[in-house]
Swiss-Prot record:
Gene: MOT2
UniProt-listed InterPro entries: MOT1/MOT2 (IPR031563)
Protein name as it appears in the record: Molybdate transporter 2
Reported tissue expression: Expressed in leaves. Not detected in roots, shoots and seeds.
Membrane-spanning intervals of the chain: 33-53, 62-82, 116-136, 172-192, 223-243, 309-329, 348-368, 374-394, 404-424
Membrane topology, as annotated: Multi-pass membrane protein
Organism: Arabidopsis thaliana
Motif Tonoplast targeting signal: chain residues: 8-9
Role summary: Molybdate transporter required for vacuolar molybdate export during senescence.
GO terms for cellular component: mitochondrion; plant-type vacuole; plant-type vacuole membrane
Length: 464
């Protein structure tokens, strides 16, 4: 009896090819895994603080953000980060009274609905195309430097989870979260990754030297760059959690928390929108969509659709916030951090998403006991490299005018702690400089031609 095989339909073949492309490594596996943890310097402190202060459901947050990582890794084919909405988190824990989980969810859903509306109507794509590049670079520079400043404070001072800020007491030199540990992690990452150059760029530089010397240096640099430095440092931090507090083993409970839909009252919507969503919306538009699209073009030579990124942020939060998950967005700082430590494909964040799912399903809310003992100095080191990588995206501002706009925008953003304020000043400055160099002769010629045409029309005989 003959057996026949049915070939794949064209649509099935194209879908399989699309999935294979999305699941293809663009860097060695060790580098992709190292890059996957490159943005945890911001993720862990904010999640830990919201869990301890605002009673955030950690298990639900890990499960939903794990699904987000997997979905965005497949959708965008780059290490698209999933990070907390920082302005909402800051308001939730630093202002009195603290926001409740329902109010945090209302703020996240309000921000998400705004970004979804901007993306669906095409307004986000319009903004992306008309905003001057020096202004975007100014926002990126200010965000990167703010990350770096915060990272240095994490390394130098003890961390206060009640305020989401470093405390005034300096960090001790010795100990399992001391300065020596943080400095050792810093030196290890610098020696293994250098300034963050790609291998191709390093090979091009070495090609100009003598052949024997360049070959030995190339082998040494390839060996160093193959070390998953961020992954090793993060794994060391996890081990130190159990050494610092062995009672963690007794407090761990297996299984996720029960899913439930939050009850959000009208007062929760009002408080969440007025106190947290209003300052978050401009930051999400600038840093989570526009800056991410610009940075992806710089790092991966891939132009992302501002519409797709905006809708992605909207859909994620309109689903997860109703179950108590932390409001999240895509951040340029997280993208820069993951790229800095070796992530080049969407498979990197897929690995991260799988890890979050496993932790959320196995340990649930008890995982906060582990996070509470994680050395903050190590997180500061990871955050420092992410901030520097984001700030270095502004290196393409070659003209003095572009650099002037960028620096003014960054200075205002950092002084007022508001990316929206710096963005507004940058746009006004850009328009003033363009108005200053506007060719007035064209305006004069146009006015003269209009006057002459008016005289000719008056002199022409009218038909009776």
């Amino acid at each position: 009896m003959e057996t026949t095989t049915t070939p794949l339909l064209p649509g099935d073949r194209s879908r399989c090819g699309w999935l294979r492309r999305r699941l293809r490594l663009k860097n060695p596996l060790s580098s992709e895994l190292s890059g996957a943890v490159g943005d945890l310097g911001t993720f862990i402190p904010i999640v830990l603080t919201l869990t301890l202060v605002s009673n955030l459901d950690l298990s639900t947050t890990l499960i939903f953000t794990g699904f987000y990582n997997i979905a965005t890794g497949l959708l965008f084919d780059i290490p698209m980060p999933v990070q907390p909405m920082k302005s909402i988190a800051a308001v939730a824990v630093s202002e009195s009274p603290h926001l409740t989980p329902s109010q945090i969810a209302a703020a996240g859903a309000s921000t998400a609905a705004t970004l979804l509306l901007l993306g669906a109507t095409g307004a986000m794509s319009f903004l992306y195309n008309i905003i001057p590049l020096p202004v975007v670079r100014g926002v990126q520079l200010s965000q990167g430097l703010q990350f770096a400043f915060t990272a240095i404070k994490y390394v130098r001072f003890n961390y206060d989870t009640a305020t989401l800020k470093p405390s005034s007491s300096p960090r001790i030199w010795l100990g399992l979260d001391g300065l020596i540990l943080a400095l050792a992690a810093l030196l290890f990452i610098i020696l293994s990754t250098g300034s963050g150059n790609d291998r191709e760029a390093e090979d091009g530089d070495l090609a100009e030297t003598s052949s024997n010397e360049s070959q030995s240096r190339r082998r040494r640099l390839r060996l160093l760059s193959s070390i998953p430095s961020a992954l090793i440092v993060f794994a060391l931090g996890l081990v130190l959690c159990f050494i610092r507090d062995p009672s963690i083993f007794k407090d761990l409970k297996f299984g996720p928390s029960k899913f439930h839909i939050l009850r959000i009252s009208w007062d929760d919507w009002k408080i969440g929108f007025l106190r947290a969503a209003i300052p978050q919306i401009p930051l999400s538009v600038l840093n989570s969509v526009i800056a991410v699209c610009k940075l992806s073009n710089d790092l991966f030579d891939k132009e992302l659709s501002a519409t797709t990124v905006s809708i992605s942020v909207g859909v994620m939060n309109l689903i997860g916030c109703w179950f108590g998950a932390m409001p999240v967005c895509h951040g340029a700082g997280g993208l820069a951090g993951q790229y800095r430590f070796g992530a080049r494909s969407g498979l990197s964040v897929i690995f991260l998403g799988i890890g979050k799912l496993i932790v959320g399903l196995v340990f649930g809310n008890s995982f906060v006991r582990i996070l509470s003992q994680f050395p903050i100095g190590i997180l500061g080191v990871l955050l420092l490299f992410a901030g520097i990588e984001l700030a270095m995206a502004s290196k393409d501002m070659n003209s003095k005018e572009d650099s002037f706009i960028m620096l003014v925008c960054a200075a205002v953003s950092m002084t007022g702690s508001s990316a929206a304020l710096g963005f507004g000043c940058g746009v006004v400055l850009y328009l003033l400089l363009k108005l200053r160099t506007l060719d007035c002769s064209s305006v004069t010629l146009f006015s003269r031609s209009s006057d002459e045409s008016q005289v000719d029309s008056e002199a022409a005989p009218r038909d009776v």
